[in-house]
Amino acid sequence: MFSFFKKKLKFFYKRINEVLFSLIYKRPKLRLKEKDFSEKIFDIRIDKNSYKLFEFTDGRIFTDGNDTTAYISKNNNISEASLQYKKFDFINSKIQKSSRNEVLSKGTPKFKKKVNGNLLSLLSGGASRDNFTHWFTDIIPRIKIYQQKFDIKNIDKFYIPSMKYKFQQESLSYFGINSGNVISSEKYKHVEAKKIYATTHPCFHKPTMVKEWSIRYLNKIYKSKSNLNKYQKIFINRDQVKLIDKSNLEKYSEYRVLLNENEIKDYLTSIGFINIKPEEYSFPDQLKMFSSAKYVVGLYGAAMMMLAFCKKNTKVLEFKPVGGGMEFRNISKLAKLKHRQIILKPLVKSKILQNGILFCPISRIKNELKLLGLKNP
């Protein structure tokens, strides 16, 4: 009963909040056929891929930090640069038309932060706020799209999904971007600037459609030339089997875990692999490790993004749930790596397609490593 009233109270509070803020900030509208001279759109071409760069004079941005980001012109029109995602399962979303953007019905119920200068928005949906892979496929390549037209030195502030993780801070530092010239959408959800720049999505909202130019750009900015013998054979150890109760697997069906992870780790260690948890290292150190690797073995997941920084012809073995995507195999293809997969059906059905409790026989690993050219696996 208490929970019911709490939900009702929260609903009424949000509605009252929306009404009050609509008196402060006029609710945005869809632009009809007339031209909006406060918004410029530049066509950008990278390789054979077409993108758009948007420039707003005295525009504003509103985001809920997750599924909705609205770019609003000085004339209060919502731009096609806006993002409006709708979940189609427990974790995955699809982009919708601008007419489905929530600001059209709910307005912009947050006070504005004003920026006296040029602002480049790198917002890209909720996943890019926390996920290592999405940060490098959805966020960083937007800088390249902007650079096709303008010098990044012209930007005074960068509007980003988050700055709470070390890898975010470290990766931005390569551009000379630091805490002094970023605005986090986790803190400020409504901003206004003299000039706002935004781009279309680098891989068109599809993780499996990361482009070759994007991988080239990441390597130009970040790739290390280290050759550390210690890290020639890497096993990405998620170390998560300890989180589950093996006597009650159904309870953990939404996890992504190799049930025999310890057995796999022991086997790989016995043939010269070193076990690493990438998140325990700085981003520059991760770059050194993966650029030194000749073999990489790991479970489908964000840490596999580091394949983008491996040398040409590095051999990769990926454990992939049957419902997982092909984004890391695609990255390997673009980076010219040799990539094989062991596709595993979850022992217990998961509501999240790319997850599940998995088991991989050592014999399958031996066979795949042999096919990748490892002697005496």
Regions found by a protein language model. Give the residues of each.
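The feature primarily captures lumenal catalytic ectodomains
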Residues: F2-P377
